[in-house]
Structure formats: structure tokens, C-alpha cells
């Protein structure tokens, strides 16, 4: 009798642990799909343009430094405004950064440019006064970048 009571208690404990794990997993999936919707909703173009301007340096030689600086600053502000429309969570910020990387991957001409882009991209949250993701894999699937 004591053995069956212990067995029933153990079985109940396993079921509770499994249900708790499933609930946590569903919550994570819900967070992820919420982030995906948010990333789809915001305009990441200003962020892409801001980072490309930073890594390309002087693109138009006839522009004065002040004009280029103002344009880059405007792009950064527009980028930060767009990112501010999303939840400031590690997961959502990482998904936004991943999307920017994926969108610009084909424009990055060599390995050095890819590394510069990733560095600037990881600095973007701090530039906007957001929390930076602790871990964020910016490698694009398919090995393109």
C-alpha cells in the first residue's frame, strides 16, 4: 500500500512538472509570435540605412560633413522611433536585429563588411537607449552572410 501511494505521488509530480513545462513553452511561443508580428509591423528601413551609412563612410563626396552627419542622425532617430514601437524585450529586439541583418545581407560585399555591419547592428539598441539582447545570433540561415 505504501509503495502504491509513493508511486501515485511520483506520477502526480511528473504530471505537474510536465504541465508546467508545457505552459512555459507555450508562453515562449506566444512571445515569439508576438515579436514576429511587431517586427513585421515596424519599418526597419531607417535602421538599415543608418547602419549602411555608418559602415560605408563618405558615399557622396559633394556633401559637406554637416549634411552627412545630419542625415545619419535623422536616420538614427527615425530608426529609434520605429524600434520604440516594439516591446523592449530581449527577444523582440533580437528578432528586429535579425530581420535587419537578413534584409541587408545581399548588399554586404565581403566578410569584413559583414562583420562591420554586425558590430554596428549590435550597438544599435544602446544608441537608441534600449536594452541590448544578451545573446543574439545574427547569422543568416543558408550561410549567405
Swiss-Prot record:
- Could you tell me what induces this protein? Repressed by water stress.
**Which residue pairs form cystines in this protein?**
35-92, 47-79, 80-128, 94-136, 105-145
Task: Write down the superkingdom of origin.
Answer: Eukaryota
What one GO molecular function would you report for this record?
nutrient reservoir activity
Report the Gene3D superfamilies cross-referenced here: Plant lipid-transfer and hydrophobic proteins (1.10.110.10)
One Pfam match: Tryp_alpha_amyl
Metal-binding recorded as keyword: no
Its keywords, alphabetically, are: Allergen, Disulfide bond, IgE-binding protein, Seed storage protein, Signal, Storage protein
Expressed, tissue-wise, as follows:
Expressed in seeds. Not expressed in roots, pegs (budding ovaries) or leaves.
SUPFAM superfamilies tied to this protein: Bifunctional inhibitor/lipid-transfer protein/seed storage 2S albumin
List, alphabetically, the InterPro entries matched: Bifun_inhib/LTP/seed_sf (IPR036312), Bifunc_inhib/LTP/seed_store (IPR016140), Napin/2SS/CON (IPR000617)
Annotated signal peptide: 1-21
Q: Which family does the similarity line name?
A: Belongs to the 2S seed storage albumins family.
Q: PANTHER family per the record?
A: 2S SEED STORAGE PROTEIN 1-RELATED
This protein's name: Conglutin
**Organism from which the protein derives:** Arachis hypogaea (Peanut)
Amino acid at each position: 500500500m505504501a509503495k502504491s501511494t509513493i508511486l501515485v505521488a511520483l506520477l502526480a509530480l511528473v504530471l505537474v512538472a510536465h504541465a508546467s513545462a508545457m505552459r512555459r513553452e507555450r508562453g515562449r511561443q506566444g512571445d515569439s509570435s508576438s515579436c514576429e508580428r511587431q517586427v513585421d509591423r515596424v519599418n526597419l528601413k531607417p535602421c538599415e540605412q543608418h547602419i549602411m551609412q555608418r559602415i560605408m563612410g563618405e558615399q557622396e563626396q559633394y556633401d559637406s560633413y554637416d549634411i552627412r552627419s545630419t542625415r545619419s542622425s535623422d536616420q538614427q532617430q527615425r530608426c529609434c522611433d520605429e524600434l520604440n514601437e516594439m516591446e523592449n524585450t530581449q527577444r523582440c529586439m533580437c528578432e528586429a536585429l535579425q530581420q535587419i541583418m537578413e534584409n541587408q545581407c545581399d548588399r554586404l560585399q565581403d566578410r569584413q563588411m559583414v562583420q562591420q555591419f554586425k558590430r554596428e547592428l549590435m550597438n544599435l539598441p544602446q544608441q537608441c537607449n534600449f536594452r541590448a539582447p544578451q545573446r543574439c545570433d545574427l547569422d543568416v540561415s543558408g550561410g549567405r552572410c
